[in-house]
């Protein structure tokens, strides 16, 4: 959905002129992103204050006499040498090669927000012990692994080592800045603090404060500390400045990734002299590319990679956050006392990372790898893995704003059948609801929604309807009345219901940080409450940043009040996660906990992967937007959000046929595959294109559906282990420096390499095939190429450059039907691509495709296929799973094989049987026809 500047084009109903006039005055109407509507660091007072602090000796000192070491953690006080304010550092060793530390005020005037509901559990502890000590430092040893932590007292600093190698330093540049809470000055005292949890700022210093010592530079209240104005919006700050900042130094690291969401390259850029990367969930109309502006979601996780090591930093803070990246060269002289702990000589490259958040505490997890797969598992152990989606959601989704009415929906449904195109889901945008009242249907356009859903169900198709988290203020609207009467809306500073302007006009915003609100919302998806809904109706949560058309930066006022007395500034980036969570819970509960939900959300945070899919938002029908979808989804996958996609064709503008074809080809090889379009664009259903383009799109859809068993297995692996589905090349080839900057091609699992064509009029692409000693097979021609090399590959409009790695086995369905549900019992064909050593392996996950029985009743199959010594073996990769299925093995295609004299099938309890085969000597492809064995059975095929 588009934001403020899209309103002029989007509103065609009676209130359109009011919205347009109002928003035109407030924010201005433009044809692209208006940067003036969004803050720079200079315009964000806390970012400006934090960034004004330059590297140097830290004013903080650790009071080693206060150190206490317990079974779960170490605590020590930190003192600011100027203000004499005390902080407390809590340090924990964690199992699985992780460390956590938290810094908070020792005696806060008011508790600071600690982010709940992101961690799936309290991480298990690996005890710390003191292994050395002198007058200015303490050496700690972790119970797991060869790790030591050096706590230096003056200036305060942490260094984390593996054996005698320095991995990471904290506050090495002296940029720790913790704005402690204080009483407002007399000149600032005219404003009363907001009603919250009852804690009121005092008007006099705390006991022990020394006024003459609190008037130094660190105590000066700079502009914006107690009140801030941006454009026409005033932000009261009743609790004063409360920002936190800290630096991390990563010696040996030159390549860092993560901290999505940004429309930028995969590798993070140095931000010195420019804008930091911003993490603040915002509805950005027609966002620009290749800059660090905030977008719809925020995941405060940064990954660092070199050929020998991977590390992660997880900054658990839900407030507005800025991240500075700088490049350095660290010689031994930089480390001072750390000389004693370092080996080698000379200088080493270094990346420095600086985090700055408006409120909250400093809560950091250090993920120590050592490999990137270890980092993925470590992060997944903290925040959970990608939810296993229902099979249908991996098919093709047809959407636009908006399908007009029931007849239009059913015509689109029939169009896919008439043109022999597969499709699983049709989508409805905001116009389907009665006056933008969510959980309702427009009675003139959708008078019989259940009948429409039944018609789709008869075709084994689904419907997704939008349910946004803003509620029309209307006394006759049951949803609004209940929320108001129950007191479940976000409040203003004075305690009244917060109202903003969005699609329905004046709207209330449910307080999803309140567990009672989330339970109420989940209950709204029951079939009784959501009238006209049915089991094949699923949900789209748009605008959940939250988007407020007349709010500052198109979002909510920061001094709005949430459950527990917290301000919106404390919880902003987690709001969208809570919407996603409550909706997914609702879809799960409506089936009695049996059915897996499908929910697409635009805003997200760390942990959102547990609740469904995300997409890259309101993109544009331009070639650069096609290109940028690759690094955007790769970045999301690196931080756990594997189920990602981009609007095929671009949301804004009308794509030329070539661009639309190329987008379908790319979308077919990205996890979430949905075409979507703006209200004012032309209709884009594939059959409306000239026949030559329609045929190419049909082929792209066919490739997607053929690979559904492979996609489903990849999503299960992401769900089980936390590894991304769509991977940068360096994840699989961590020592190949050439791969570290590549973001125009990617891997699906470890088997397929995809290089989409993303340039207009392209006649060829440069494909990098990685891996010393690897071979790669073109999946269409079976031509073999050796790695590592850069290959020029000629392309036509019908080309999708995809290669299968030698050494992998990919399962496919070869009969493309109208939807995935129509294919789920079809036989499997195995594509076995042999390595130079004549080996290959792969997996296949199967279950019923839609319930939680794979979890609750162990009803699933995970089969492992292995080829070596001219023998293909099928065995169980997880003996705990059991699932009866009619699926059988129809064919085996072995790529890179010689011609055997005979092929023999062996199954337990049955005599050997010979299989017919066909061999093509030009392509070295051997096809084994109709082994006819159930996919759940153990068997072996021998080439003799």
UniProtKB/Swiss-Prot annotation:
Record-linked SUPFAM superfamilies: (Trans)glycosidases (SSF51445), Galactose mutarotase-like (SSF74650), Glycosyl hydrolase domain (SSF51011)
Its EC number(s): 3.2.1.207
The keyword Ribosomal protein is annotated on this UniProt entry: no
UniProt subcellular location: Endoplasmic reticulum; Golgi apparatus; Melanosome
UniProt binding sites for substrate: 283, 429, 602, 676
Subunit text: Heterodimer of a catalytic alpha subunit (GANAB) and a beta subunit (PRKCSH). Binds glycosylated PTPRC.
Reactions catalysed: N(4)-(alpha-D-Glc-(1->3)-alpha-D-Man-(1->2)-alpha-D-Man-(1->2)-alpha-D-Man-(1->3)-[alpha-D-Man-(1->2)-alpha-D-Man-(1->3)-[alpha-D-Man-(1->2)-alpha-D-Man-(1->6)]-alpha-D-Man-(1->6)]-beta-D-Man-(1->4)-beta-D-GlcNAc-(1->4)-beta-D-GlcNAc)-L-asparaginyl-[protein] + H2O = N(4)-(alpha-D-Man-(1->2)-alpha-D-Man-(1->2)-alpha-D-Man-(1->3)-[alpha-D-Man-(1->2)-alpha-D-Man-(1->3)-[alpha-D-Man-(1->2)-alpha-D-Man-(1->6)]-alpha-D-Man-(1->6)]-beta-D-Man-(1->4)-beta-D-GlcNAc-(1->4)-beta-D-GlcNAc)-L-asparaginyl-[protein] (N-glucan mannose isomer 9A1,2,3B1,2,3) + beta-D-glucose; N(4)-(alpha-D-Glc-(1->3)-alpha-D-Glc-(1->3)-alpha-D-Man-(1->2)-alpha-D-Man-(1->2)-alpha-D-Man-(1->3)-[alpha-D-Man-(1->2)-alpha-D-Man-(1->3)-[alpha-D-Man-(1->2)-alpha-D-Man-(1->6)]-alpha-D-Man-(1->6)]-beta-D-Man-(1->4)-beta-D-GlcNAc-(1->4)-beta-D-GlcNAc)-L-asparaginyl-[protein] + H2O = N(4)-(alpha-D-Glc-(1->3)-alpha-D-Man-(1->2)-alpha-D-Man-(1->2)-alpha-D-Man-(1->3)-[alpha-D-Man-(1->2)-alpha-D-Man-(1->3)-[alpha-D-Man-(1->2)-alpha-D-Man-(1->6)]-alpha-D-Man-(1->6)]-beta-D-Man-(1->4)-beta-D-GlcNAc-(1->4)-beta-D-GlcNAc)-L-asparaginyl-[protein] + beta-D-glucose
Pathway(s) per entry: Glycan metabolism; N-glycan metabolism
Family membership: Belongs to the glycosyl hydrolase 31 family.
General function of this protein: Catalytic subunit of glucosidase II that cleaves sequentially the 2 innermost alpha-1,3-linked glucose residues from the Glc(2)Man(9)GlcNAc(2) oligosaccharide precursor of immature glycoproteins. Required for PKD1/Polycystin-1 and PKD2/Polycystin-2 maturation and localization to the cell surface and cilia.
Disease per UniProt entry: Polycystic kidney disease 3 with or without polycystic liver disease: A form of polycystic kidney disease, a disorder characterized by progressive formation and enlargement of cysts in both kidneys, typically leading to end-stage renal disease in adult life. Cysts also occur in other organs, particularly the liver. PKD3 inheritance is autosomal dominant.
PANTHER family reported in the protein's UniProt record: ALPHA-GLUCOSIDASE, NEUTRAL ALPHA-GLUCOSIDASE AB
Listed Basic and acidic residues bias regions: 203-236
Region (Disordered): 181-238
Regulation: Inhibited by deoxynojirimycin.
Residues annotated as signal peptide: 1-28
Active site residues of this protein: 542 (nucleophile), 618 (proton donor)
Glycosylation sites recorded in the entry for this protein: 97
Entry keyword set: Disease variant, Disulfide bond, Endoplasmic reticulum, Glycoprotein, Glycosidase, Golgi apparatus, Hydrolase, Phosphoprotein, Signal
GO terms, biological process: carbohydrate metabolic process; N-glycan processing
Name of this chain's protein: Neutral alpha-glucosidase AB
Modification type Phosphoserine: residues: 52
Expressed in which tissues: Detected in placenta. Isoform 1 and isoform 2 are expressed in the kidney and liver.
């Amino acid at each position: 959905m588009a934001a403020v500047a899209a309103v002029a084009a989007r509103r065609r109903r009676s209130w359109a002129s009011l919205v347009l006039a109002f928003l035109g005055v407030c924010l201005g109407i433009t044809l692209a992103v208006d940067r003036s509507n969004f803050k720079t660091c200079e315009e964000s007072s806390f970012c400006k204050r934090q960034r004004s602090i330059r590297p140097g000796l830290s004013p903080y000192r650790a009071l080693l006499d206060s150190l206490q070491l317990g079974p779960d953690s170490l605590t020590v006080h930190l003192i600011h040498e100027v203000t004499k304010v005390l902080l407390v550092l809590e340090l924990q060793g964690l199992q699985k090669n992780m460390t956590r530390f938290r810094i908070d005020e020792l005696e806060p005037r008011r508790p600071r927000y600690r982010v709940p509901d992101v961690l799936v559990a309290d991480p298990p502890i690996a005890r710390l012990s003191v292994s050395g000590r002198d007058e200015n430092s303490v050496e700690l040893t972790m119970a797991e692994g060869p790790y030591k932590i050096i706590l230096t007292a003056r200036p305060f600093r942490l260094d984390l080592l593996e054996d005698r190698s320095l991995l990471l330093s904290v506050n090495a540049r002296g940029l720790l800045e913790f704005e402690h809470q204080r009483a407002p000055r007399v000149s600032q005292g005219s404003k009363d603090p907001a009603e919250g949890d009852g804690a009121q700022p005092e008007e006099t210093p705390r006991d022990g404060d020394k006024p003459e010592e609190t008037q130094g530079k660190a105590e000066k209240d700079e502009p914006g500390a107690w009140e801030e104005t941006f454009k026409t919006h005033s932000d009261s700050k009743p609790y004063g400045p409360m920002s936190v900042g800290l630096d991390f130094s990563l010696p040996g690291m030159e390549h860092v990734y993560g901290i999505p969401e940004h429309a930028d390259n995969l590798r993070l850029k140095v931000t010195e002299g420019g804008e930091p990367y911003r993490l603040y969930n915002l509805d950005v109309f027609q966002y620009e590319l290749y800059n660090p502006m905030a977008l719809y979601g925020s995941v405060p996780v940064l990954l660092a990679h070199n050929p020998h090591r991977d590390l992660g930093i997880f900054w658990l803070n839900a407030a507005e956050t800025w991240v500075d990246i700088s490049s350095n060269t660290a010689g031994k002289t930089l480390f001072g006392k750390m000389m004693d702990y370092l080996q080698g000589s000379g200088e080493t490259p270094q990346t420095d990372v600086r985090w700055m958040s408006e409120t909250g505490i400093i809560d950091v997890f250090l993920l120590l790898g050592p490999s990137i797969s270890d980092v993925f598992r470590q992060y997944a152990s903290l925040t959970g893995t990608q939810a296993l989606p229902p099979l249908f959601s991996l098919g093709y989704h047809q959407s636009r704003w908006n399908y007009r009415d029931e007849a239009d929906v059913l015509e689109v449904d029939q169009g896919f059948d008439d043109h022999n195109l597969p499709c699983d889901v049709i989508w409805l945008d905001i116009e389907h609801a009665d006056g933008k009242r969510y959980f309702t249907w427009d009675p003139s356009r959708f008078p019989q929604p259940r009948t429409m859903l039944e018609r789709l169900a008869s075709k084994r198709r689904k419907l997704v309807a939008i349910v946004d988290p803003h509620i029309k203020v209307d006394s006759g609207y049951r949803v609004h009345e209940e929320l108001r009467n129950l007191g479940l809306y976000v409040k203003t500073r004075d305690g009244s219901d917060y109202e903003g302007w969005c699609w329905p006009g004046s709207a209330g915003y449910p307080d999803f940080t309140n567990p009672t609100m989330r339970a109420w919302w989940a209950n709204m998806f029951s079939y009784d409450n959501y009238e006209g809904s049915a089991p094949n109706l699923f949900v789209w949560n748009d605008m959940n940043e939250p988007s407020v058309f007349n709010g500052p930066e198109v979002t909510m006022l920061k001094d709005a009040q949430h459950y527990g007395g917290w301000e919106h500034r404390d919880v902003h980036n987690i709001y969208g996660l809570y919407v996603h969570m409550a909706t997914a819970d609702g879809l799960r509960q409506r089936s009695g906990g049996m059915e897996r939900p499908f929910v697409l959300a635009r805003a997200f945070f760390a942990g959102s992967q547990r609740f469904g899919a995300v997409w890259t938002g309101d993109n544009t029908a331009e070639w650069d937007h096609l290109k940028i979808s690759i690094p955007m989804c790769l970045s999301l996958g690196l931080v756990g959000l594997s189920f990602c996609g981009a609007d095929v064709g671009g949301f804004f503008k009308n794509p030329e046929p070539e661009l639309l074809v190329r987008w379908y080809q790319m979308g077919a090889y990205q996890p979430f595959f949905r075409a979507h379009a703006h209200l004012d664009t032309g209709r884009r259903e594939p059959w409306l294109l000239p026949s030559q383009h329609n045929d190419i799109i049909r082929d792209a859809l066919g490739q997607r559906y053929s690979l559904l068993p492979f996609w489903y297995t990849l999503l299960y692996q992401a769900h089980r282990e936390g590894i991304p589905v769509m991977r940068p090349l360096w994840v699989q080839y961590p020592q190949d420096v050439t791969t570290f900057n590549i973001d125009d091609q990617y891997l699906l699992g470890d088997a397929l390499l995809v290089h989409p064509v993303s340039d207009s009029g392209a006649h060829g692409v440069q494909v990098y095939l990685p891996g010393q000693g690897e071979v790669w097979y073109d999946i269409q021609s079976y031509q073999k190429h050796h790695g590592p090399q850069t290959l020029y590959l000629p392309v036509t409009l019908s080309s999708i450059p995809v290669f299968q790695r030698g050494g992998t086995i990919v399962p496919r369905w070869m009969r493309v039907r109208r939807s995935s549900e129509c294919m789920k019992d079809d036989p499997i064909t195995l594509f076995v691509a042999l390595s130079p050593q004549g080996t290959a392996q792969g997996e296949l996950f199967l279950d019923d495709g839609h319930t939680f029985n794979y979890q609750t009743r162990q009803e699933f199959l995970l089969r492992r296929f292995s080829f070596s010594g001219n023998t293909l073996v099928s065995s169980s990769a997880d003996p705990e799973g059991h699932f009866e299925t009619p699926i059988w093995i129809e064919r085996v295609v072995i790529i890179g094989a010689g011609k055997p004299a005979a092929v023999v099938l062996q199954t337990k309890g049955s005599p050997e049987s010979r299989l017919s085969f066909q061999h093509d000597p030009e392509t070295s492809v051997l096809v084994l026809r109709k082994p006819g064995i159930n996919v759940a059975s153990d068997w072996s095929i021998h080439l003799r």
